[in-house]
């Protein structure tokens, strides 16, 4: 049973209204980022809806007591209680996912990523866990990515050079350009995501690497 079916059209619509037109409550984990104001609004709305579910639980419990001896009514109440519990669990899981996505977005922006969504695609997000306010496993991956793909980040690069100008000896195999591998070259380095980022962020570099890969 979907979350929409569990909550009903009215409650589900309230949350969608907070997310904005075209949003899908169950699609928070698809990689799209959520602005802080929307995060706060939806998080507040979730708390309100969770309270409504708790109130329903209490009402169903009271009805269950009164329905003693009425098997059919008791069975229907039991089904409603089960659906209510599933809805609460779905709310909790989705709230945690929302917090995770918001924390990851913030961490990516703080890391200096030029395009947070593109950099996220290069991370193993399955191994990054949210523990309270900390993202476990994020720093190690970002550090490694900055060393390997420094052109994806703003400011001074971790290899010691200034963005777009690597120190002597760095990227020599690619004409002195700030990258250690060619994403256009067939083989283990071939990467369509990085190609797209290069064409958007540095078209000249993209053309040069593309020509060298032929």
UniProtKB/Swiss-Prot annotation:
GO terms for biological process: viral capsid assembly. It holds the Pfam family Phage_scaffold. Residues 154-190 are annotated as: Disordered. The keyword Glycoprotein does not apply. Residues 36-105 form a coiled coil. Keywords: Coiled coil, Viral capsid assembly, Viral release from host cell. Scaffolding protein involved in the icosahedric procapsid assembly. Coassembles with the capsid proteins to form the procapsid, in which the scaffolding protein is found within the external shell of icosahedrally arranged capsid protein subunits. In a subsequent step the scaffolding protein molecules are released from the procapsid. Homodimer. Interacts with the capsid protein gp13. Belongs to the SPP1-like scaffolding protein family. This is Capsid assembly scaffolding protein.
